[in-house]
A protein has these predicted regions:
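Accessory terminal regions of nucleic-acid processing enzymes
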Residues: 1-157
Length: 157
């Protein structure tokens, strides 16, 4: 609306994740004996103004979501042997945008001994969840369009 570029924010933890992601991708490729195709923004096939940025595409059916958290968070993931729930929506929407059938969640911490650095868990596509989420995204975008139209009307007064 303003035409101005928004401010960006980064901290040491975010920078660590950015710096470490290529190492995590390489470790995953070695473990799974695959090549990961890096992609940028992938628009949703039917919802205009929606899309996702997965960390990579794997084969014909998969994608990759990499997290390089702090050591305590990575250890919790190792101990639970499960994907933190807060990432499910992100991965499901990535599958909706890419048409992929599964997402390998990766947690990686190269500050730990080699055998503890990498955690991989496959998450299958959930079409029922995706449908509900897509309905909510469409609803949100429609509400946003209404608000923008109201602001434009005020601007033209």
């Amino acid at each position: 609306l303003t035409g101005q570029k928004g401010e960006s924010f980064t901290n040491a933890a975010m920078q660590h994740g950015t710096d470490t992601e290529p190492l995590a991708r390489a470790a995953y490729e070695a473990l799974q004996d695959v090549l990961v195709d890096e992609v940028g923004f992938v628009p949703h096939p039917s919802i205009i103004m929606a899309g996702a940025s997965p960390d990579g595409l794997v084969g014909d059916d998969g994608l990759l979501e990499i997290k390089c958290p702090n050591t305590a968070t990575h250890i919790e993931t190792l101990l639970s042997q499960s994907v933190p729930g807060k990432y499910n929506t992100q991965m499901q929407f990535q599958m909706a945008c890419t048409g992929r059938q599964w997402c390998d969640f990766v947690s990686f911490d190269n500050r730990l001994p080699d055998e503890l650095q990498l955690f991989v868990k496959r998450v299958p596509r959930d079409n029922e969840f995706i449908k509900q989420m897509e309905d909510e995204v469409v609803k949100f975008l429609n509400e946003l369009d209404i608000k923008i139209a109201q602001l434009m009307d005020l601007k033209n007064v």
